[in-house]
Amino acid sequence: MDTTPAPQPAPGADPAATPDPTPDFTPAERARGRALRRAQQPWALGARLAGLALPLLLGLTPAGAALATAVGRWFGDSRTATVLAGAAALVVLGQALQLPFGAAVRSVRVRYGLVTQGWAGWALDALRGLALTLVLVLPLVLGLFALTAWSPQHWWLPAAGAAALLTAVLSFLHPLLVEPVFNRFTPMPPGELRTALLALADRDGIRVRDVLVADASRRTTALNAYVSGLGATRRIVAYDTLLTTAEPREVELVVAHELGHVKHRDVPVGTALGAVGAAVAVAVLGLLAAWQPLLDAAGASDAADPRALPLLAALAALLGAASGPAQCAVSRRIEARADRHALELTGDAEQFVAMQRRLALANVSDVDPPRVLELLFATHPSATRRIAAARAWQAARVTRTAQGTQGRQGTEGTQGAQGTQASHSSHASQAGQAGQGRPAPEQHRTDPGKSVV
């Protein structure tokens, strides 16, 4: 594995400057990715804004309290009924508001050949997502309001610990309970590729339970692979679209990137950070929810009041939106590190570039998006940046190799010259001793791997 240090930018160079995509993508390819991004961008941004505006409208005005009270009456008007019905209403309204935006984005992607799923399948996925969200959210909300009833002032202390624990548990259970809801997984048949992927993981010192194929082609033409799970649940998952489109060596590089996440413990570290973030978020919620002006605006008496549920949802949405750019920045850094791991593990920068080009074209990516959009929303570096980083890695590797070769040649030359001098000195000494009638001592043997002093 190569240990070449990360290349440093040239003096005066701007490390944040966008690399030139011209050598790797034609004007038509760049234009196609840019056109897709511009076509779906208004709808994607609209979905984000709508997803934030709705909880703010309901949580910072009496409208949310009125909604929770009204739907609670339909189910008995008890505190528990108001909490559960209010939470369900917020989830359903939020999902319903997102549907038009999601449908518009889907229509755009259909025009670009990225969608293989019909509208019926899309609607079924939306219903599955809604059901899964309700199954996860309703018990959590019920537990939360049990804590607020226990102590309207200090509920957030045990809630913070519970949030951290649940984050860790859900991270472990996600590949077992959530992924199968949306995809079918089958073991990759025995063959050269499966053997190569398992050997790659073994060479990297990573144990995986299995190599699975996800039936992503039912929905999309996009290419992807990932490693999911922790410990006994860890497995390599490849999209069937990747296996039918990419070269085997490119598949190995995609998996090598994902193994980088495992090698650097990105999942457990991310889970730990997520757990800490969840605990901090709950603590902040506890402090804000105790502020009387906010409670008055929401039409609630205190945090134990079921009518405070929309306020808590609004504050959580604000915290999530505010932390989004920071989370994206951390994600881009992690992805860049995984790219470097793939290069070190395979040593194949040329094939890495080919793989990045294939992924960008298959996914119709904007290879050089506006920097502000990249900073705010991108979880991965752009294809242009990833290719430039791979070429910089290769250049640094070549330079290091050349320097190492020159150093070895210089050492060997020094050893040879010193050995010749020692030989001449020894012969002269032997000749002098022989002339004096004394036996010549045993000639000193020089280790060819060390310099003669």
PLM features per residue range, with description:
Residues 2-301, 321-404, 437-453:
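Polar-ligand-bearing catalytic/cofactor-coordination segments
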Residues 394-442:
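Intrinsically disordered, low-complexity repeat/linker tracts enriched for polar/charged residues
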Residues 298-322:
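Generic long, charged, amphipathic alpha-helical segments
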